[in-house]
Amino acid sequence: MCSLPRGFEPQVPEDLERRSLAELREMLKRQERLLRNEKFICKLPDKGKKIFDSFAKLKAAIAECEEVRRKSELCHPVSLDCKLRQKAIAEVDVGTDKAQNSDPILDTSSLVPGCSSVDNIKSSQTSQNQGLGRPTLEGDEETSEVEYSVNKGPASSNRDRVPPSSEASEYHLQHRVSSQAEDTSSSFDNLFIDRLQRITIADQGEQQSENASTKNLTGLSSGTQKKPHYMEVLEMRAKNPVPQLHKFKTNVLPFRQNDSSSHCQKSRSPISSEERRRRDKQHLDDITAARLLPLHHMPTQLLSIEESLALQKQRKQKYEEMQAKLAAQKLAERLNIKMRSYNPEGESSGRYREVRDEDDDWSSDEF
């Protein structure tokens, strides 16, 4: 019988409820890893039935946790509202406890003829508004409606029993909470109205006049101010420029101001090209012992289009002739052709004739 490795045993249903969502997902990954191993599942006696059951339970538990989490996220703003309401109710309860402590004072006021709980509420509200310094319109309307309903009632209602002081104090505290909320809303409204009142629309003519006046004021202020130091330095440098220092060069005579002035005067006068060439040559002779080679060709000249085309054609023709000669020479070298003088009779025939002539001369001498 094969046993599951440690950490991969199927969990008991009671344990799943106590686990967190991250732990449940980790357990689900382990079960999936076991289910992928088919050889291991085939070796089990129940063929992995327990693993499948635990896998399904884990999936159901994860789905339930996600559903609870989603509902809690949806109900989060509602819970915040409920907390705020609970705080307000707690404040009201504290106020009722304080009011119950002051019951004897309220009872003495209720014994006075012609006085009712509504009058007490009105007096307390007016004192509160005087202390805050900001009465609200809605609160006044509510108090007027209450007074109207009380006065409109039958005379027998005045003879009835006066309501207890605890109910009056509770109503008073609830009304105070509502009045505080109305005060905050009215303060926001007043702030918005103040911001709107600060916005002003001006004409273009008035704006231009304001701009001109501001420019005049700035001009007067700038006229009275002193120029900055760097502006004065720049103006002085523009009036009295500093002579530029020439860089040191080898094989060059030191620069002199008189020579430069005389050179400027000479340059102003017209000089021919031959005179300039002669001066340049003299200058080279003064500064160096080297001599330029004589020119073998004429200097460059400006030619017309027709002359340039004719020269290009002539050059192309010479180039082709030279290429043909080189090609013929290379071909002859490959074929091993040698140009020699041709003698059809050969050297032997010539020698024979020369010998025969000698014999003839010898025979003639004998005779």
From Swiss-Prot:
Residues 117-131, 176-185, 205-225 have a biased composition (Polar residues). The keyword Ligase does not apply. Residues 357-367 have a biased composition (Acidic residues). It is found in: Nucleus. The modification Phosphoserine is found at residue 269. Its main location: nucleus. Dephosphorylated at Ser-269 by the PNUTS-PP1 complex, promoting RNA polymerase II transcription pause-release. Residues 117-185, 203-225, 254-281, 335-367 are annotated as: Disordered. Pfam families: GCOM2. Residues 226-297, 314-339 are annotated as: Interaction with Pol II. InterPro entries: GRINL1 (IPR026213), Tuftelin_GRINL1A/MYZAP/CCD68 (IPR051375). One of its GO terms (cellular component) is I band. GO terms for molecular function: transcription elongation factor activity. Residues 29-68, 298-313 are annotated as: Important for transcription repressor activity. Keywords: Coiled coil, DNA-directed RNA polymerase, Nucleus, Phosphoprotein, Transcription. Component of the Pol II(G) complex, which contains the RNA polymerase II (Pol II) core complex subunits and POLR2M isoform 1. Pol II(G) appears to be an abundant form of Pol II. This is DNA-directed RNA polymerase II subunit GRINL1A. It comes from Pongo abelii (Sumatran orangutan). The lineage of its organism: Eukaryota, Metazoa, Chordata, Craniata, Vertebrata. The gene is POLR2M.
